[in-house]
Regions:
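N-terminal Rossmann-like NAD(P) cofactor-binding subdomain of oxidoreductases
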Residues: 1-186, 221-223, 256, 268-284
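Generic solvent-exposed, charged/amphipathic alpha-helical segments
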Residues: 17, 210-214, 255, 259
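Glycine-rich beta-alpha junction loops
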Residues: 36-38, 126-127, 151-158, 190-198, ...
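A broad structural signal for alpha-helix termini and local helix breaks/kinks
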Residues: 142, 217-218, 245, 262
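Oxyanion-binding "anion nests"
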Residues: 189-235, 240
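C-terminal active-site/capping subdomain that shapes the small-molecule cofactor and substrate pocket
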Residues: 224-286
Length: 286
């Protein structure tokens, strides 16, 4: 399969390539796409060197699949151009997610909604996917009425420049003396917002979790109350979730469902200090 990765030299694009390799995805030809300053660079994938190409060259090559992680404006401009030449696009940006003509998909939840003619498929926000994958089997069993969620999101969610900011701060850099992507220092600090605030008082990140949950679960009646927080962790988002169900349940059954859910690893033995932590979840696919 001929695969293009748009944003291949970025933090998420690099991780995409790692996962493709880990899962032995059938890539016969790789088209790493990046901005003009990176064109011509060499990257290694599955033991071979590949040359970074322009989007125009990648489109001309008519790949079978294009994975996008280069920001919303890039997706808005380039995804239709890939689709026009017969390339199926999976977009990691927020641009297409709430477009009523596009499917917003978590394969384990609603992969069956994808049809042959769906050439641009939206990938949900990272915090939404992380929340909904374990909640889907619980929703099917008990019908979720309300979700109250707080997220503790790594600086990696902002990219390389955020990691550089935290590294500079940990090295003793003084505020204003190093490039910063956050409005305040992040080391030894937390930022009580991710993305900008809206008139409602929620942030854009929080509203993504609300709107995307409704679209993926195909149920606008579910109450979603999110608080998203940036924490000084380099790799691995965490979430605390409180659920209200329509139907009766037992904790034993909830644990059993979690244990049986593909993609979920249950760590729930607080008496022995066993619980999920980003340090140990980083780099894992569950």
């Amino acid at each position: 399969m001929k695969v293009a990765v748009v944003g291949a030299t970025g933090l998420v694009g690099t991780r995409m390539l790692e996962v493709l390799a880990e899962r032995n995805f059938p890539v016969t030809e790789l088209l790493p796409v990046a901005s003009a300053k990176s064109v011509g660079r060499k990257i290694t994938f599955q033991g071979k060197e590949w040359t970074v190409v322009s989007a125009e060259d990648a489109i001309a090559a008519r790949p079978d699949l294009a994975l996008f992680s280069a920001g919303g404006s890039t997706s808005a401009e380039l995804a239709p151009k890939f689709a026009e030449v017969g390339t199926r696009v999976v977009d990691n940006s927020s641009h297409w997610r709430m477009d009523p003509t596009k499917k917003l998909v978590v394969p384990e939840i609603n992969g069956d909604v994808i049809e042959k003619d769906d050439m641009i498929i939206a990938n949900p926000n990272c915090s939404t996917i992380q929340m909904l994958l374990p909640l889907w089997p619980l929703h099917k069993a008990y019908t979720i009425k309300r979700i109250v969620v707080s997220t503790y999101q790594s600086v990696t969610g902002t990219g390389y420049k955020a990691m550089d900011q935290m590294t500079a701060e940990r090295a003793g850099g003084k505020w204003g003396e190093y490039p910063a992507v956050y409005p305040h220092p992040i080391d030894q600090n937390i930022l009580p917002h991710i993305d900008s605030f809206l008139e409602t008082g929620y942030t854009k990140e929080e509203m993504k979790m609300v709107n995307e949950t409704h679209k993926i679960f195909a149920d606008d009646s579910i109450g979603v109350s999110p608080t998203t927080v940036r924490v000084p962790v380099q790799g691995g988002h965490s979430e605390s979730i409180n659920l209200e169900f329509e139907k009766d349940f037992t904790l034993e059954d909830v644990r059993r469902i979690m244990e049986e859910t593909p993609g979920v690893t249950l760590q729930d033995d607080p008496a022995n200090n066993v619980y999920p932590m980003p340090l140990y979840a980083w780099g894992k696919n569950d």
